[in-house]
C-alpha cells in the first residue's frame, strides 16, 4: 500500500509538472500580444529607470538619437539572462552602435552586482536601471526572461523576443531578415 501511494504521488507530481503551459517565443506579430500596450504604442516606452548611481534616472531622452535600440528586461539571477548578456558581449562589435537598455525589477544591490560582474556599463551605449514602478512587464506582457524589444533608428518597434536568442537572430531582425514584424 505504501509503494502504491508513493507511486501515485510521483505520477501526480509528473502530471502536474508536464501539464504546465510552455511559454513560446512570442514575437510582436503573435496574436496573443494583440492587446498588449506595446502593440498599441509601438515606440520606445516612457521608462523611468533608477540608474546605477542610485540618484539619477534613465529615460528615453537619455538615449542617443538615430540608433537602433534594444530594451532588455532581465533578472540578475536568471541563468538565461546571463547567457543572453554573455552572447551580446561575445559579439559586442555588432552591437556597439546600438542603444542597449537593460532593465530589472530585482533589488538594486543585485543589479549593481550584475553590472560589476559583466561590466556592461563600461560600454557607453549600454544603460542599466531598476524599473522601480514595474512598468515594463505589463507594458510588454512579459512571461519569461530575458525579454528583448527591438526598435529601429526612429524608435519604432521591430519585434520582441522572450527567452535567450542567438545574436544572429537579433541582428537579422534588425536587418529585416527572420522574425521581424515590420
Predicted features, each with a name:
Residues 44-45, 68-69, 145-146:
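Short loop/turn microsegments at loop-to-beta-strand junctions
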Residues 22-61:
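N-terminal "domain-start" segment that seeds a small globular fold
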Residues 144, 150-182:
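Thiol-/selenol-based redox modules, centered on thioredoxin-like
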Residues 82-120, 135-138:
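Structural microenvironment flanking redox-active thiols in thiol-disulfide oxidoreductases
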Residues 118-149:
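Short, internal strand/loop/helix patches
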Residues 59-82, 88:
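Short active-site neighborhood of thiol/selenol oxidoreductases, capturing the structured segment around
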Residues 1-25, 177-182:
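Bacterial Sec-dependent N-terminal signal peptides
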Amino acid at each position: 500500500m505504501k509503494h502504491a501511494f508513493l507511486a501515485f504521488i510521483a505520477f501526480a507530481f509528473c502530471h502536474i509538472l508536464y501539464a504546465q503551459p510552455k511559454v513560446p517565443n512570442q514575437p510582436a506579430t503573435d496574436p496573443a500580444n494583440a492587446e498588449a500596450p506595446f502593440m498599441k504604442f509601438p515606440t520606445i516606452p516612457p521608462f523611468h529607470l533608477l540608474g546605477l548611481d542610485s540618484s539619477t534616472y534613465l529615460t528615453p531622452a537619455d538615449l542617443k538619437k538615430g540608433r537602433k535600440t534594444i530594451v532588455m528586461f532581465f533578472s540578475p539571477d536568471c541563468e538565461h539572462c546571463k547567457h543572453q548578456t554573455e552572447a551580446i558581449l561575445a559579439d559586442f562589435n555588432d552591437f556597439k552602435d546600438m542603444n542597449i537598455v537593460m532593465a530589472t525589477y530585482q533589488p538594486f544591490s543585485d543589479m549593481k552586482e550584475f553590472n560589476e560582474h559583466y561590466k556592461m556599463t563600461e560600454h557607453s551605449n549600454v544603460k542599466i536601471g531598476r524599473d522601480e514602478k514595474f512598468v515594463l512587464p505589463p507594458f510588454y506582457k512579459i512571461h519569461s526572461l530575458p525579454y528583448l524589444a527591438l526598435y529601429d533608428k526612429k524608435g519604432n518597434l521591430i519585434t520582441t523576443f522572450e527567452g535567450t536568442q542567438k545574436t544572429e537572430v537579433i541582428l537579422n531582425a534588425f536587418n529585416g531578415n527572420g522574425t521581424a514584424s515590420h
